[in-house]
Amino acid sequence: MEFDRRKAAALAALASPAPDKSPKGGVDAPIAPLLDALNSHPDLFTTSSCSGRVSVLAQPPPPQQADPGGAKTKKKARGGGWVYISHDPADPEALVEVLFGVKEGGGGGDDELVFRFEPMIVAVECRDAAAAAALVAAAVGAGFRESGITSLQKRVMVALRCSIRMEVPLGQTKELVVSPDYIRYLVRIANSKMEANKKRMGGFLDLLQAKISLEASYLESQDPVLQNGAKHGFGNAKRHVLISLSFYPAFISPHGVILTQEEALPTLSGNTTHCLSTAALEITGEPIEKLFLWGQSACALTVGREHHILTFGGFGGPGRHARRNYSLLVNPGSGLLTELKVTGSPSPRMGHTITVVGNDIYVVGGRSGPSEILNDIWVLERSNNRWSKVDCSGDFFRPRHRHAAAAVDRKVYVFGGLSDDGLCSCMNIMDTASIQWNVISPDDKWPCARHSHSLVSYGSKLFLFGGHDGQRALNDFYSFDTTTLKWNKENTNGKAPSPRFSHCMFIYKDYLGILGGCPIRESSQEIALLNLKHKIWFYVSIPSLSQCLCVRSSSVIIDDDLVIVGGGASCYAFGTRFSQPIKIDLHLLESIFKLAYNKEKEMSVQHGSVSNVDLLEGHEENCNPSDNVKVVIDTATLGSSPLVLQLEKKYAKLAKDILKKFGWLDLTRKVRVSQDNIHVLFPVSKTFHALITDKHLKVQPDDSCVFEELLPFSENKLFGASISLQKALEILLLCRGSILKDEVAISRKASKTPQTIMRELVSVLLDKKGLPSQLLEQLPTRWETLGDIIVLPKTCFKDPLWESVRDDLWPLVAKSLGAQRLARQGKITPNGTRDSTLELLVGNDGWLTHHENGICYSLDATKCMFSSGNRSEKLRMGKLDCRDEVVVDLFAGIGYFVLPFLVKANAKLVYACEWNPHALEALQRNVMDNHVADRCIILEGDNRLTAPKGIADRVCLGLLPSSECSWDTAVRALRAEGGMLHIHGNVNDSDESLWLDNVVKSITNIAKTHGLSWNVTVEHVERVKWYGPHIRHLVVDVKCRAT
């Protein structure tokens, strides 16, 4: 690899005794240990460095501009040389002697003298962007806050630096304007900065060495292949784990002080001994960038029978980051992201709250700009998806943001926040029935004023935790009784969560959970949980949270899942980072709590994706099982649910043979692999569960040796010896498995297809109406999906008899296909605007939003055509590199190819020509929805009159059956030096060569008529689809080059 080659060359140069290209000729001694630490990492090497220096530089004065009104010349380095330089603390008397003791020589009399202190700076090349980001994060945490990524092109470069430099002009070499005492004063300041620079370097070195030591320990516990792979910097997932281990700033105190490993460890929660499984939420539909927000607010929302997450507002989003006011729906099961089509949306904002009251959703306050703090109230009426502003009476509600809100019964309770007057400390109660505010003033027992805290409801109580009081982060914990309107500071057992703000808090059953927030520390990788019945804190580890920034995120409970959306942070040094949505399975919490606080303390717990409970707990003491004999049993949540046995893959063959032999494998469900791809999940019977948890089942200490001998056995060898039921259970026990609920419960029973359901329903209808059963032959066997509309082919239901039962027929067909709206395709009108004749059968409105190739297309399907058959061509156009290109689309339509050019190919500018008013309406909407309107110029009318001339790098001609009417227009649109034409056409498969020859000949002749001497060639022919019998939709890429 090029990186490894460059690193080897750089390290060889460092080790060489020959002087390098720097003025000094070698590495500064104070920085040598830090460079060694950086260069020892497989993903980094240093290219230049300076440990920090005190210097006086003599440089020529800037040249005078002869003509002030003339053109400015390019700025050039002024040159010069050092009068004094030291990489150690400067000697003030030696510098005074240099400046005042010698009156002659040492440079020209007109040279300007500048006293400087420059802190450490190191240039580091990184293997990839992930390593660079991790290194910058570590450097910023160590105090080098000006560090950043300087290049991501051919080489990934990072500059490590800070801002404690100083620069003071002293005058000219023969005319100093300062005194010797002032020089001594400057040296004292510079030396203090030098000392601070040295401490930061030492802290950064300690951090790197501690992390590299941690990485080495991690590697020692891994297999040799991984050790070798990490040593050579292989670009796999495990290497990214090593990056995280090496550079995540876990040993940095909230005050920025570097701690040793021993000092940092006590800050961790001492009883973090359990783990919960997590999974990234794979987003489909709308671009995931729409969820890249912080300061948004979210809640659970039921749509039909499915639970969704509604998010509103926040800062970020696609393109240039800004405050947003779109309403998004996330399906936590499928990951489908859709934008809720609403009317009357609130203004863009962040730092607001969103609260569910009955069927309504209330948005309170927020901030729409640095000085625009809001106190407006909006309600989303779910019946018609309309946002309405609420005019409240009663007490005055101060504008605020970063407050917290929760609902009990029909009232919304708002506490704290930031306003123009400072922090808020009163409790504001809005009665949604009377639309009236009631403000309760604080007393001595109330929580102090704060912002960025959390508030949740539990029965008739509200719980408040953390926040920031303007001076420090808080970790006090209060409850508010909504019946007595009194606050109470809660007394709890166990270690309380660390102080934090901008965190998440949630209620799951009888547990209150807290995670994330600022300051970011190692405890950010765990959830603090309070059992609300026993008032006991305990902690559950979520290792994957180390890769997230759960700061100003939103947490929503959906069934047994905790879904975290949004969140992130911005740093001057390495820009903005947003968190991807994740889902955490909470269904084992009850079991974890019982295990953690079991009075007999006889169980053993391991880290993993679930809590690992010693299956042998309660056995006779003389059993002394091996430490490795552990199986997870979630007795609290299993109930009557179907069960699975989770085992590591290496035990899968042996376990499957045993389960099948004794009839414990449930054959009605599928064996499947876990999400982490490490385990296999076997569906098992309740009989197996009863046997495996039998209190009298014993495993002898030496059984593990027998077990290892059995692993390679085949089924025939294993059971040829007539293995007993007792021995089979003991072997499975030694596999260290987990008995879990089968959440998916995938059934092997064949379900009915939509065609079968449709046939059954329609058959009953025909019998009821006395119509012939032969009509069933006209039922569709395929259909198309556009947004939420199922589109039937025009060839189905052709007999006029269907019209007599249409009112009963179409709802049945829609039901069989699971469609909200149903339509039937008609012929595309063969006119200049190619209008759609799609017939809407179920539903009142033809407007839809269709997602394809990561792009959002909105259109009225009854007026505009949409061809899914062109998907591959749209994908091909999106894969082009058009970053510096101007594109002209002569037949833009709703943006079929305009949007791929803009969204995916990153075209510099696209001119979109269209004359269909319905398509124009959709096109204008689509460039806005996809956030590319600033790079698209829409030209309404006949392209032969409106298209630009002489500016295009490429032209798209997407009209079928032929675009020949605008070939002349396309040639005139290209630049004089030529460009690319993408010409569409419907061509008989036997005439393809003739058509291509005609295209080249025609374009050549057109160019000549316009005085253009071009070499016209066919670069590529794309066969998109069959348009009809022997008729192909072709796209030819025609390259025009000036000769």
From Swiss-Prot:
CDD domains: AdoMet_MTases. Keywords: Kelch repeat, Methyltransferase, Multifunctional enzyme, Repeat, S-adenosyl-L-methionine, Transferase, tRNA processing. Pfam families: Kelch_KLHDC2_KLHL20_DRC7, TRM5-TYW2_MTfase, TYW2_N_2, TYW3. Kelch repeats lie at residues 360-410, 412-460, 461-510, 512-559. Residues 700-1041 are annotated as: tRNA wybutosine-synthesizing protein 2 homolog. Pathway: tRNA modification; wybutosine-tRNA(Phe) biosynthesis. It is an enzyme of class 2 (transferase). InterPro entries: Kelch-typ_b-propeller, Kelch_1, MeTrfase_TRM5/TYW2, SAM-dependent_MTases_sf, TRM5-TYW2-like_MTfase, TRM5/TYW2-like_N, tRNA_yW-synthesising, tRNA_yW-synthesising-like_sf. GO terms for cellular component: cytoplasm. Residues 1-233 are annotated as: tRNA wybutosine-synthesizing protein 3 homolog. This is tRNA wybutosine-synthesizing protein 2/3/4. It comes from Oryza sativa subsp. japonica (Rice).
